[in-house]
């Protein structure tokens, strides 16, 4: 139920990947059922819906890959499908936690010059363009090209909470490059990828979990009653 509750709570979280519980039935030596054990909790790799926001700094990945973001506090790099970025007070593209978006070289994208440009746009290959007050545009260069990370086995990524992931021995290291290259997806500016949680599936799971709990509780109650009856017979 905890997994289901967590999924439902994040149905509106951009880039959130539904958690999936894998369990197995335990069987006692006599062949009787002995309950259920949790084997693992992983996440669904299915893409969520692409949702328009109209904000140029919001980005969705149309295809394979993850954004790379770096914590300015400890320098640790995380990977995410959540493209809800914005400019911070210093002009850096950051997520809601203040983690800076990385470029194709794996470095934080330099601060954008908001004094020279009235706005910006991002093309499908991750190039950031400055828009001057007179409407003319300027490609800000390779240092400002958004990178996309891929992994040899993305199912091996480890959840770091929310929509952030870290690589593991199973996933392999991140391979950061240009959007649209090496099987990486292209970018869509002004959109975000929504949560891939299906409310319908979670409600079905909740009903089944409740039914299983009630059935197990009934079995325990019946077993207790039978044991009590046997004790009464012996006495």
Model-found features: residue ranges?
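Amphipathic alpha-helical polymerization modules
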Residues: 1-106, 112-235
């Amino acid at each position: 139920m905890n997994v289901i509750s967590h999924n439902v709570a994040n149905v509106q979280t951009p880039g959130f990947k539904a958690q999936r519980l894998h369990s197995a039935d335990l069987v006692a030596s006599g062949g009787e059922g002995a309950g259920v054990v949790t084997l693992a909790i992983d996440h669904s790799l299915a893409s969520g819906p692409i949702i328009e926001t109209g904000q140029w700094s919001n980005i969705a990945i149309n295809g394979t890959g993850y954004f790379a973001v770096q914590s300015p506090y400890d320098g640790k790099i995380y990977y995410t499908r959540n493209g809800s970025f914005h400019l911070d007070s210093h002009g850096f593209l950051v997520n809601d936690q203040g983690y800076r978006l990385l470029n194709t070289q794996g470095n934080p994208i330099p601060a954008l010059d908001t004094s020279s440009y009235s706005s910006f746009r991002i093309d499908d290959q991750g190039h950031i363009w400055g828009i001057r007050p007179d409407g003319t545009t300027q490609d800000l260069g390779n240092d400002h090209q958004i990178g996309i990370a891929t992994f040899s086995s993305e199912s091996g990524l480890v959840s770091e909470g929310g929509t952030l992931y870290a690589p593991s021995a199973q996933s392999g290291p991140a391979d950061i490059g240009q959007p649209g290259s090496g099987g990486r997806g292209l970018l869509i500016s002004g959109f975000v990828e929504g949560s891939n949680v299906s409310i319908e599936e979670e409600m079905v799971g909740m009903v089944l979990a409740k039914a299983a709990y009630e059935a197990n509780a009934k079995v325990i109650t019946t077993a207790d009653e039978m044991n009590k009856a046997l004790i009464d017979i012996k006495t």
